[in-house]
Design a protein with these regions (language model features):
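Regulatory loop-to-helix N-cap segments in sensory/regulatory domains
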Residues: 134-135, 170-185, 189-192, 196
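Sensor-regulatory modules in signal-transduction proteins
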Residues: 157-160, 174-175
Length: 197
């Protein structure tokens, strides 16, 4: 009976550990979802409450930057007629250099591979830029390296099924797989940009 009691005790102990682990995982998932929902509401509130479109979008980029614990968050818009992309909005974390002035008229060919990725995949994440060196256009790689970008998330801005730009997040340290969050935000950004036009 002693051996059987020990086996039952060990089984009970293992079952309790398993149950506690599941509760911990569920709690973490709920906390992450709550943070995500709260941040999304904050983004929508910022865009709808602020009458100044530029100011609203800049504040929105700050909120996104904090959510991803990233270095820089920005919006690029495509000018098809001039075959360039320009950095129209940017937020940089404290101690991180702003690049908006350096990226005003970038030839569209530099991001041609990104546009193809947007068309194929919708959004993408580069976890390690050095591992992508052979797959990226050399000029795009050098441009990102010069800005100390090691990883990034990019989600297209879409109007009438046409890619008109993208939102980028440089060096995200948290939530870096949360494409649905950025995709949701891009919808609200497009609505707000349309009111500016």
């Amino acid at each position: 009976l002693g051996g059987m009691a020990l086996i039952l005790l060990i089984t009970y102990f293992i079952w309790n550990l398993h149950t506690l682990w599941e509760l911990f995982e569920n709690k973490t998932k709920v906390e992450n979802e709550l943070e995500r929902s709260s941040t999304l509401i904050h983004c929508v509130t910022e865009l709808s409450a602020n009458q100044d479109v530029d100011e609203a979008i800049n504040h929105l980029l700050e909120i996104i930057n904090q959510y991803f614990k990233s270095d820089r968050t920005y919006i690029f818009e495509i000018d098809e007629e001039r075959q360039i992309v320009h950095n129209s909005y940017e937020y940089a974390a404290k101690g991180v250099s702003k690049e908006i002035e350096n990226l005003n008229e970038v030839p569209i060919q530099i991001i041609a591979s990104w546009i193809k990725k947007f068309e194929r995949e919708g959004s993408f994440y580069i976890s390690n830029l050095d591992l992508e060196k052979d797959r990226e256009d050399e000029r795009a790689y050098e441009c990102l390296k010069a800005q100390n970008v090691n990883s990034l998330i990019a989600v297209p801005l879409i109007r009438n099924r046409e890619i008109i730009g993208f939102i980028g997040v440089d060096n995200p340290r948290k939530n870096y797989r949360d494409f649905p969050f950025l995709s949701s935000v891009q919808f609200f950004i497009m609505n707000r940009l349309d009111t500016k036009a």
